[in-house]
Design a protein with these regions (language model features):
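Substrate-binding pocket helix/loop in short-chain dehydrogenase/reductase
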Residues: 95-96, 100-108
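Residue(s) in the substrate-gating loop at a strand-loop-helix junction
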Residues: 139
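C-terminal helical subdomain
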Residues: 179, 195-230
Length: 253
């Protein structure tokens, strides 16, 4: 599977940045979006030596109209998109004793509605053309509820459910959809974590795994494998076994 034109949100740092550079090295023309224009300009400059090209389109994914305009401009500039990676997101820990509305509202706007705005802009085009591939970056934290992740985990669970719901309908039109569920990846976001992160991998490693999974047409691209399978086992546990484990996480934190 080859892609000539790609759009990636959340491209300024972390997984998005590494993924863009990987695709540019393969010769793709990659439109990149993030809120911080300086990050995108630096990314485009770093990609100068690649066989592909990186084109900055600064954007706040919570602005529906801005997302639609950006997709219009991108396709006018580089042509119909082959692959869209909806990667923009944030993490805000929420503890029960400091429970408040704002982190939920913020993460719903960025993590969920940011993806919805992207899908609303590209899916009608893909369906009309009967081709295209969209990848939604969620997280293994969306598999099941975890302490301090009431907002973040819920937002990522929504993305997984959304992708599962859309897949059988998009299959009818030849449009691919994938959901990416990483474990811990070393990025500026995870650098803020104050707890151990087992099986931590680098952003370049994550980008390679994502590209490999997308090329193979996988619906779910989850990594690293041992960490993912541990979470999938937890997802199957009855509450009588699951909650004693998560209570230990609260005690240890």
């Amino acid at each position: 599977m080859t892609w000539r034109t790609v759009w990636c949100t959340g491209a300024g740092k972390g997984i998005g940045r590494a993924l863009v550079l990987r695709l540019a090295r393969e010769g793709c023309r990659v439109a990149v979006s993030a809120r911080t224009e300086g990050d995108l300009v630096a990314l485009a400059a770093e990609a100068k030596g690649c066989s592909g090209e990186v084109l900055p389109y600064p954007l706040d994914v919570t602005d529906e109209k801005a997302v639609t305009r950006a997709v219009d401009n991108i396709e006018q500039s580089i042509g119909p998109l082959d692959l869209v990676v909806l990667n923009a997101g944030n993490h805000i820990p929420v503890r029960a004793e400091a429970f408040s509305v704002k982190p939920f509202r913020d993460l719903v706007e960025i993590n969920i509605m940011g993806v919805v705005h992207g899908l609303a802009a590209v899916l009608p085009r893909f369906i009309e053309r009967k081709r295209g591939h969209v990848a939604i970056v969620a997280s293994v934290a969306g598999y099941r509820g975890l302490p301090t992740a009431a907002a973040y985990g819920a937002s990522k669970a929504a993305l997984i459910n959304m992708a599962e719901s859309l897949k059988p309908e998009l299959d009818r039109y030849g449009v691919r959809i994938s959901v990416v569920n990483p474990g811990f990846v070393k990025t500026p976001l995870t650098d803020r974590n104050e707890f151990p992160m087992p099986f931590l991998i680098g952003a370049d490693d994550a980008a390679n795994r994502i590209v490999r999974g997308l090329r193979r047409g996988r619906f779910e691209i989850a990594f690293p494998r041992r960490f993912v399978w541990g979470f999938k086992v937890l997802r199957c546990l009855p509450y009588g076994l699951y909650f004693p484990l998560t209570r230990r996480l609260v005690t240890e934190s």
